[in-house]
Amino acid sequence: MIYGILAGNKLHLSEIARSLKEEVTLKKTMDRLSRNLNAFQEKQPLMQNYLTLVKQHIKDDYAVIVIDNSDIAKPASRKLEALSEIRDESTGEITQGYLTIEAAVLSESGKMPLPVYEKVFSAAENGFVSETHENLCCLKSLSENFSRKCIRTLDRGFDANDYYRYFLKRSERFVIRAKKNRNVNT
């Protein structure tokens, strides 16, 4: 798999399979790679090793972590699993697709965002609770892996009491872009 990624310089499974130039059909190579990826059980140790490397490039006492929700619109797709109705942020229309939560920490120089959390989810998945639950899972992962002193920055989608309570309970530093209807007492 790693050889295929390096040789093909792409992350699409079909391109990785093509770059391997195996004697079997492309479909069989893709099926094997897909099956092996699905059976991969070392995600947690791999992620911890990656986060250890990331931490070498940040200053814990003032690092900025950017947390953002987004969507993947798939309006023409009918066969993808767990498609649900989403609001396409680029058009404002309701369509089929997936939601995402992503977090990146800025490197010490501030020039490079280093991804530290990423999840694609759908309301149609088994076990789905809510978008707030998925967001809190992201925040918990960040709390486990980064200092309270890191500044979490979030857009107005996070302007809800659940998130304020979360950060205040843990004494974590945060900046949330407020919605227009947020009342602030000074």
Segments predicted by a language model, with ranges:
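Active-site-proximal, Lys/Arg-enriched surface segment
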Residues: 2, 30-109
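Short, basic interhelical loop/turn and adjoining N-cap
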Residues: 19-32
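Short, charged amphipathic recognition helices of the HTH superfamily
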Residues: 8-18
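Noncatalytic, typically N-terminal accessory segments of nucleic acid-processing enzymes
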Residues: 15, 25, 79-82
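An internal, acidic/charged active-site-proximal segment
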Residues: 119-186
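Short, conserved catalytic/metal-binding motifs centered on acidic residues
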Residues: 16, 63-73, 103, 150-160, ...
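A general structural motif
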Residues: 60-62, 98, 111-113, 147-149, ...
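Short, conserved acidic/polar surface loops in the N-terminal third of protein domains
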Residues: 75-81, 114-117, 163-165, 186
